[in-house]
Amino acid sequence: MNNRVHQGHLARKRFGQNFLNDQFVIDSIVSAINPQKGQAMVEIGPGLAALTEPVGERLDQLTVIELDRDLAARLQTHPFLGPKLTIYQQDAMTFNFGELAEKMGQPLRVFGNLPYNISTPLMFHLFSYTDAIADMHFMLQKEVVNRLVAGPNSKAYGRLSVMAQYYCNVIPVLEVPPSAFTPPPKVDSAVVRLVPHATMPHPVKDVRVLSRITTEAFNQRRKTIRNSLGNLFSAEVLTGMGIDPAMRAENISVAQYCQMANYLAENAPLQES
């Protein structure tokens, strides 16, 4: 039997499809999401409706974003979900979540079992809409969740950690084994909750500057920041901010990266493109 076939659908490798089928895990995720009637619930990648059905049962209306046209068509004719669903058959990577929140008149509650091949770039896409999002619950590769929640002085800490924690409070929810999926992925999975900060703990003047600094620092993470960020900051400037130029990218806190971004935004602002 082809273990890529589930409920008559052949999982497509190019879409990174792995279908959740463990009822205990499904119940645990739905409990963590705790959907309520009247909320603007949005699912990314509903697939074969493992989460869509139990979430949809609790709601009068549910919005889903599904790239796979066959799966979108199945959802349209779903016996009890069909009338409740608003289906966008398009790529979540290009979806305008801000427009949807405006249309629905409230911040979105976004959830999904995300395709692992696009999970990191999709996170960055969603971060640009945190003003329009109340919270997010995602199943991700465990390694990605570890990176999202990592603190300084750890191998997992990187650009994704800094940017995620700049925008959101990041909370791990549960770990999920490969056996919970068809076909089983080659990696462990985990569920994470991301709640955009109501008030930014470390506001920056220009988030593009923060993005640039973290990209340059972590692209050369084995170098000291005296070297990796030498084109942006002198050792004297870093020392003046209380940041040791001999530290590496992984030793610098989110607050310190934001401090550096604000210094650069004031003293060498990016030109509008």
Swiss-Prot record:
Full protein name: Ribosomal RNA small subunit methyltransferase A
Enzyme class: transferase
Domain of life: Bacteria
Record's keyword terms, sorted: Cytoplasm, Methyltransferase, RNA-binding, rRNA processing, S-adenosyl-L-methionine, Transferase
SMART domains (alphabetical): rADc
Catalytic activity: adenosine(1518)/adenosine(1519) in 16S rRNA + 4 S-adenosyl-L-methionine = N(6)-dimethyladenosine(1518)/N(6)-dimethyladenosine(1519) in 16S rRNA + 4 S-adenosyl-L-homocysteine + 4 H(+)
GO molecular function, one term: RNA binding
Sequence similarity: Belongs to the class I-like SAM-binding methyltransferase superfamily. rRNA adenine N(6)-methyltransferase family. RsmA subfamily.
Lineage summary: Bacteria, Pseudomonadati, Pseudomonadota, Gammaproteobacteria, Enterobacterales
Protein residues bound to S-adenosyl-L-methionine: 18, 20, 45, 66, 91, 113
Function description: Specifically dimethylates two adjacent adenosines (A1518 and A1519) in the loop of a conserved hairpin near the 3'-end of 16S rRNA in the 30S particle. May play a critical role in biogenesis of 30S subunits.
Subcellular location as annotated: Cytoplasm
A Pfam short name: RrnaAD
